[in-house]
Design a protein with these regions (language model features):
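Active-site-proximal loop/hinge segments that shape catalytic or ion-binding/gating pockets
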Residues: 7-105, 110-288
């Protein structure tokens, strides 16, 4: 009888696998405080609702390259762009030393300007986030190891402080499936404790993590690109996230907290829809 070969729970670049075992990545979720919480049966049902609602939030990939290239070839990892002068990449030597140049990078719910390029490609989230080719960290490695990014091509040469920072970063790597659970738990707990239970507020483009996909992403997975200078399209996307997913991107969060009375009034109808979404979820969590 032939043996059944199960798909791997997580796939890592070979260089990254040399410094962290895949089994360790699978257990890293317990490094997050969200997994110190033991939800009761009603909260578990509410978490399932949040998880589904957030899986309907598109991923995004911002690019400074010609969008027609991505529409033809998909999102290509930097390792495959060595001789391609028509593409743009922000990959550093430290990324390469960890094999991250074999990954394509996305954000979740960050359909707004991020400084990574003029065009944003929305990408269907569910199949990609839940695939074994996805790993996630809460932030870009550059944010904690910026002084090492461009001059470190061998992680064995890191000084003591660099090694400490790298080890802390490695502890945050989780599979996409676990990241979805972490964010769902974070959102529900925050909304349970918040005075304002109308919307889950995001404050930066990286609040929902840096998504790393091993290998290229097919052009079939990409939606039409958005020009960040097209304010009407951007704003309609933000309102859609508010109304259908109960989430405020950082631009909407700033308008709600620091905007004019006129700005807040314009958002009220969308905010009411978001409040109803969360009210249903919180009611499920509070049942006894």
């Amino acid at each position: 009888m032939s043996k059944t070969h199960e798909l791997p729970a997580v796939s890592l670049p070979s260089k990254l696998e040399s410094v962290i075992d895949p089994e360790k990545v699978l257990s890293n979720k317990y490094n997050y405080p969200e997994f110190n919480w033991n939800p009761d049966i009603h909260e578990q049902k509410a978490l399932a609702r949040v998880r589904e609602m957030f899986l309907n939030i598109e991923l995004s990939h911002a690019t400074a390259s010609d969008p027609k290239l991505l529409q033809t070839e998909g999102i290509i990892p930097p390792s495959d762009l060595t001789d391609r002068q028509d593409w743009r990449s922000q990959t550093g030597k430290l990324d390469e030393s960890l094999g991250l140049d074999h990954c394509t990078f996305l954000h979740w719910g960050a359909l707004h300007p991020t400084g990574n390029g003029r065009y944003i490609f929305p990408v269907e989230a569910r199949d990609i986030l839940l695939s074994p080719e996805i790993i996630v960290t809460p932030y870009d490695i550059h944010s904690t190891m910026c002084t090492y990014m461009m001059n470190t091509d061998d992680i064995r040469a890191l000084d003591e402080e660099g090694q400490r920072r790298l080890n802390e970063y490695l502890k945050t790597i989780v599979p996409g499936k676990d990241w979805v659970d972490i964010i769902a738990r974070r959102a529900l707990r925050r909304m349970q404790c918040a005075d304002d239970k109308s919307v889950f507020k995001v404050r930066s483009h990286s609040d929902l993590g840096e998504i790393k996909h091993l290998g290229a992403i097919s052009p079939a997975s990409l939606h039409e690109p958005i020009d960040i200078h097209d304010q009407q399209t951007m704003y309609s996307k933000w309102l859609s996230l508010l109304e259908n997913n109960g989430l405020a991107v950082s631009y909407i969060t700033n308008m709600l907290e620091f905007g004019s009375t006129e700005d807040k009034t314009a958002l009220q109808a969308s905010l009411d829809k978001s409040r109803k979404l969360w009210r249903k979820i919180l009611d499920i969590a509070q049942k006894s």
